[in-house]
Amino acid sequence: MIGIDIVKIDRISRLKARHGELFLKRFLSDDEIALAKNDATLAGFWAAKEAASKALGVGISKECGFLDIMISKSTKGAPKIKFSPRIYTNFNIKEASLSITHDGGFAVAAVMIV
């Protein structure tokens, strides 16, 4: 299963400016907030979680919320993705991979789940 998402970085910047920490905590864990050094990274994390939920075929919903999807980085800075235990079980996930890119004011993410 493959999911992709694109988001304008400015959109995430505006939401963060308007709602501050409440906005961040709606879709990120404390560890993810600590990793996100700028709005481009925040937008990439948003796109990654949306792409993952699309790969599962449910979108962000009761079946898979933002906080069921966890983004981290490898020692070399590459993005990594994990899911909550219930998501692994409910969707029979064996492996997942994530790619995030930023260009022209956009963040794009692709997630592959097997």
From Swiss-Prot:
Enzyme class at the top of the EC tree: transferase
InterPro entries: 4-PPantetheinyl_Trfase_dom, 4-PPantetheinyl_Trfase_dom_sf, ACPS, Ppantetheine-prot_Trfase_dom
Keyword set, alphabetical order: Cytoplasm, Fatty acid biosynthesis, Fatty acid metabolism, Lipid biosynthesis, Lipid metabolism, Magnesium, Metal-binding, Transferase
One GO MF term: holo-[acyl-carrier-protein] synthase activity
Keyword Hydrolase tagged: no
Keyword field contains Cell wall biogenesis/degradation: no
GO biological process terms held by the UniProt record: fatty acid biosynthetic process
Subcellular location: Cytoplasm
Full protein name: Holo-[acyl-carrier-protein] synthase
EC number, UniProt record: 2.7.8.7
Source domain of life: Bacteria
Family classification: Belongs to the P-Pant transferase superfamily. AcpS family.
Record HAMAP family: AcpS
Chief localization: cytoplasm
Known role: Transfers the 4'-phosphopantetheine moiety from coenzyme A to a Ser of acyl-carrier-protein.
Residues noted as binding Mg(2+) in the record, renumbered to the chain: 5, 50
A cellular component term, taken from the record's GO annotations: cytoplasm
Cofactor: Mg(2+)
Catalytic activity: apo-[ACP] + CoA = holo-[ACP] + adenosine 3',5'-bisphosphate + H(+)
Gene: acpS
